[in-house]
């Protein structure tokens, strides 16, 4: 299987390129190498001492990234001082900077009903709460509202903020894991 939709390399290629250990070796200056590994009796630093740094066509170095824009960014602000996640490459130019009225809903189903009833319009910021790890059981994936926005062509016109998680296939101004 491919590792990501636009990639030509498989998980087997990733394994032969050094796998997780090679990725961690490339990140050694950015991670806590004194942290224990899953094995419990070694640290990442001890484990990575035996790994030769060998960036290649599958696993790139930090100096030669696959993409200039990161796949994920952590955002902090008054809504989420502890942080939230956005996928910068998935945010349409039209909604990269959006300012509008916040419309707050207590669950995905309520927000979905509001979208379908025409209560959410271009320029609105849809806030869906209580769907994250402290709300819905199991931190479910937000789908109904996002799919409705896409289906109605509002994904390029409406912002969405939620404590839930969302699919890696979603596009638009979606801030999750608040």
Where are these regions (language model features)?
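Catalytic or ion-coupling anion/metal-binding cores of large enzyme and transporter domains
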Residues: 2, 6-178
């Amino acid at each position: 299987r491919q590792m990501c939709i636009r990639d030509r390399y498989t998980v087997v290629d990733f394994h032969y390129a050094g796998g997780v250990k090679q990725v961690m070796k490339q990140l050694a200056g950015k991670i806590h190498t004194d942290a224990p590994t899953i094995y419990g009796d070694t640290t990442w630093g001890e484990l990575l001492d035996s790994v030769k740094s060998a960036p290649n066509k599958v696993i790139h170095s930090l100096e030669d990234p696959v993409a200039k824009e990161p796949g994920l960014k952590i955002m902090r602000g008054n809504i989420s001082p502890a942080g939230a996640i956005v996928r910068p490459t998935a945010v349409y130019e039209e909604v990269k900077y959006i300012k509008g009225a916040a419309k707050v809903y207590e669950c995905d189903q309520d927000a979905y009903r509001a979208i379908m009833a025409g209560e959410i319009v271009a320029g609105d910021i849809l806030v869906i709460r209580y769907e994250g790890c402290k709300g819905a059981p199991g931190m479910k994936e937000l789908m109904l509202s996002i799919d409705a926005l896409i289906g109605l062509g509002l994904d390029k016109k409406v912002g969405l903020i939620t404590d839930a998680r969302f699919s890696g296939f979603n596009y638009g101004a979606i801030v999750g894991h608040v």
